Amino acid sequence: MTTPPPGGPNPHGTAMPAAAYGASRATLWTGVSVLITDTAGRILLQRVTYRTARLLPGGGVDPKEAPTEAAAREVFEELGVRLRISWTLAVDWVPSTTPGFDPGTCFPGEIIYVFDGGTWDGEQIAAIRPRQGEIEGVDFVDPVDLPAQMAPGNARRALAALHARTTDGAVTLEDGYPITPPPPAS
């Protein structure tokens, strides 16, 4: 088998040369969030040093890192707790026009995976050790109060993920809005 020359035919079946095909693809960031609740059904939100709005635990996916690995890493870095991540609650496409990003970042848009971090009891909550310099603290917030505590798209995403957890079905979102109706509750 021969390898096509650089810039030659694309071995993946398109009529475009490989370089042109690669350049035509969308460039997006990949991020993760983790939905953690307490036994009263309140959602863990972080007070961070770099924004006024609160956030779910999470962050960016590093190069060559799987989203589940990134979620586990972020929970450990931000909360000091080791957590196995496996269940996806939501996948959200965040447009490049989302307000709040410094123009210097050249924000291209983002795909954010929201994972289920489980329901934590008092012992798990007591083990939280917020990362100094980044996380000022954490609070468990009633779901109805999320829109007042978070940026609009983040609140919509968190609430959609919470709904997905209770209906046993992941949801696909665009800018925090479900693109299909959620499955019926069982």
Where are these regions (language model features)?
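Active-site beta-strand termini and strand-to-loop segments that position acidic
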Residues: I36-T39, G117
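Conserved positions in beta-strands of structured domains
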Residues: L35-T37, S86-L89
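Conserved beta-strand residues within beta-sheet cores
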Residues: G31-S33, R82-I85
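Acidic, metal-coordinating catalytic segment for phosphate/diphosphate chemistry
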Residues: T2-S33
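Nudix hydrolase/Nudix homology domain
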Residues: T52-A53, P130-S186
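Unchanged
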Residues: V61-R84, D92-G153
